[in-house]
């Protein structure tokens, strides 16, 4: 698994934990990383690029949460944010952050990664739901260079 995919998965877990336990995002991420630091997940890069990328994503989503949620709300037909599953919402938040604030990551990569994370962590219909909203959002953006 790529370090960016791993970072996205860690960031999702931190944002979900932050929502569920009313923790700060960075604290939630550190708590998750501490759980893996015991070596129970030897393939996990707890101190390297995965953690750095996850931290950047969590901080970026939290710093821009109002704008990100507004973008999601605008493009999610018949779905308010309050009705969305928390896993799906946080996957969308991560992807929208990448689409708007990470010009170095191509739109199609962001969307594909979000779908793959949704397959692993979401419900059966999560990948299609996330794909639909992200396609709507991405279609309104200029192509990244």
UniProtKB/Swiss-Prot annotation:
Any one GO MF annotation of this record: RNA binding
Domain of life assignment: Bacteria
Any one biological process term the GO annotation gives: DNA-templated transcription termination
Pfam families attached to this UniProt entry: NusB (PF01029)
InterPro entries (UniProt xref): NusB-like_sf, NusB_fam, NusB_RsmB_TIM44
Keyword RNA-binding appears in the UniProt entry: yes
Keywords from the named record: RNA-binding, Transcription, Transcription antitermination, Transcription regulation
Family annotation (NCBIfam families): nusB
Family designation: Belongs to the NusB family.
Function of the molecule: Involved in transcription antitermination. Required for transcription of ribosomal RNA (rRNA) genes. Binds specifically to the boxA antiterminator sequence of the ribosomal RNA (rrn) operons.
Protein name listed in UniProt: Transcription antitermination protein NusB
Source organism: Geotalea daltonii (strain DSM 22248 / JCM 15807 / FRC-32) (Geobacter daltonii)
